Swiss-Prot record, chains A, B:
Highest taxon of the lineage: Bacteria
Organism for this UniProt entry: Leuconostoc citreum (strain KM20)
Keyword Transmembrane in record: no
Annotated SUPFAM superfamilies: Isocitrate/Isopropylmalate dehydrogenase-like
Catalytic reactions on record: a fatty acyl-[ACP] + phosphate = an acyl phosphate + holo-[ACP]
Localisation: Cytoplasm
Classification via InterPro entries: FA_synthesis, Phospholipid_synth_PlsX-like
Disulfide bonds listed in the record: none
Protein name from the UniProt record: Phosphate acyltransferase
Assembly with partners or alone: Homodimer. Probably interacts with PlsY.
Length: 348, 348
């Protein structure tokens, strides 16, 4: 298999990207890598060219660039060229640590939507602290700020495929992030989405979940509209970071006694931090497009990049995209029926 | 001043409510309390009737009751009777630890909206860990699942009044919870709200805030639509609780060494937990109605109830409601102009 790598995206690109790719090359012997990037910067960093090919590009999409504009105008950027390679069948998957919006645009407009998927969405695996499994799929993380009920329904399908194919969870359960457990809770979008999902033949819906229970692991897939999904994810990250910071500060403030305690607890803290640092395990995936497209956080170092290659390999090995495609192709009536039920409800 | 107390609402009602009121009575010598509740249950709990009056009621709104229905049907419930006392001028403020939705309905339909406020909303003070002040106002916590831009604009006004009058923050700053820092981020509602707020003569708008920075204290008031505000608040609470739980578990798992460390760090953990437990400091306030209406969490114990009386006293002492009322009365043109600008934008 071949992975097209945007070598220029990310805070520590191209250095950490190239280092990560070399680790992955040594780890997975069936992956070939195409590095898209500025030759003068990337070339000196590669120590061993085995299964690594450099495709020189002349432009870079910056973190601050306006996504759609950047994708349209920077035609010789590392990201756009890597996306086009996937589109044209020269590579099987796309990886970037760069501008998320531009990667989304590249995924949707260049790699292309799977026919029948209305809105590709961003998904990630988060730690599930008390559930049956170690992780759950959370989506949409913010690809679509304005989600409709039919989109949320489709996220249930896409998320279930990711949970089964990549996290290895048999018949995954699905919940809808809402501001109450009862089915009449939420705004119109979530009320209607709940009704659609309740009768879903395509996945195993358990009902609503409130953001307070997110990390408890009461479902294998949690579906959210992109706006509140983004808010819940970021509030979770922000709170976890703030607490670790506060604990460190409290330890430093508490004199010899506290510092001794802190030293003794170091291994315990490390294990929690590791569990929380879900970014190390891989990236956010754009589900609903014609190939695996994965984004790691901008500050990803080599290890995270290498781990993400493992995640992409699993997606390819498990035929995630073709299985989604086949499912949607053979269930157009169900998806259509969902939309009609929806329209009937809205016009009632 | 007189506070009407729903003595029957909350997981530990009426015991902890009555205990809390007695603590508050001893602490604040200018407050009279009216306890609305089932006589046979409340009467035996009161140890000293000084400045405490029992108004017997025969019904109780339960946590699981459908809010509007319960408010309409249970006319002799402790909550409805307490709300009516405020409406009729027999009391200055309303307190309950009961059904939040029913309290919202009672506040809006019985106590009544301030003329000119389109949507009363739920606000709370959260800890600000790195800001200039210790706390900031976060609203709407979920009173309105479907918020319009003009509502978010009004929350900016209401929140600023709460920050100045109750938290004592001079010329408070305001931010809008959105899924990106740039002004073109978010769905239509948040894009338009940002434009309205940017030109706000009524408050000091600093721009968007992402949920990740919520606890950092970069603003004195954070305005959110009720749906994502609810999600962000609950994700914050859930993550904080989960982390404390995980730390405890990691300490227990880490042998003698870890347990010793945990024992040494106990005071440090206590101080963080106290800072995080914003519920102890008071309740969530329904802003935009004609009197202070405050809800503490259902599991509130006596201390939290007593502290909430202090919060209500500040609201009354500082003339929060009449100052909001006066401001809105004298700025109808501005509020109207905001709506017109909005309509122009929407129809453009």
């Amino acid at each position: 298999m071949k992975i097209a790598v945007d070598a220029m995206g990310g805070d520590f690109a191209p250095l950490e990207i190239v280092k990560g790719i070399e680790i992955a090359r040594d780890r997975y012997d069936d992956i070939d890598f195409q590095l898209y990037g500025t030759a003068s910067e990337v070339k000196p960093l590669v120590t061993n060219w085995e299964r690594i090919e450099l495709i020189p590009t002349t432009e870079v999409i910056e973190m601050g660039d306006e996504p759609v504009k950047a994708m349209r105008r920077k035609k010789d950027s590392s990201m756009v060229r890597a996306a086009l390679a996937v589109k044209e069948g020269h590579a099987d998957a796309l990886f970037s640590a760069g501008n998320t919006g531009a990667l989304l645009s590249s995924a949707i407009f260049l790699v292309g939507r799977i026919k029948g998927v209305d809105r590709p969405a961003l998904a990630t695996a988060l730690p599930s602290f008390e559930g049956e499994h170690d992780q759950f799929v959370f989506m949409d993380l913010g690809a679509n700020a304005d989600s409709k009920p039919a989109h949320l329904y489709q996220y249930g399908i896409l998320g279930s495929f990711y949970a089964s194919h990549v996290l290895g969870i048999q018949s995954p359960t699905v919940r809808l992030l809402n501001n109450g457990a009862e089915e009449d809770k939420g705004d119109e979008v979530h009320k209607v989405a709940h009704q659609l999902m309740k009768n879903a033949p395509s996945f195993n819906f358990l009902g609503n979940i409130e953001a307070r229970e997110l990390l408890e692991g009461t479902a294998d897939v949690v579906v959210a509209d992109g706006f509140s999904g983004n808010a819940a994810l970021k509030a979770t990250e922000g709170t976890a970071l703030m607490m670790l910071k506060q604990i460190k500060a409290a330890i430093m403030d508490s004199g010899t006694r506290g510092k001794m305690g802190g030293a003794l607890l170091k291994p315990a803290f490390k294990s929690i931090q590791k569990k929380l640092d879900y970014n190390e395990a891989g990236g956010a995936v754009i589900l609903g497009v014609k190939a695996p497209v994965v984004k790691t956080h901008g500050s990803a170092k080599a290890t995270a990049v290498a781990n993400t290659m493992g995640q992409i390999k699993t997606m390819i090995d498990q035929h995630l995209v073709s299985d989604i495609q086949n499912y949607i192709d053979t269930h157009t009536e169900e998806l259509q029926a969902g939309k009609e039920a929806l329209n009937a409800q809205i016009n009632a």
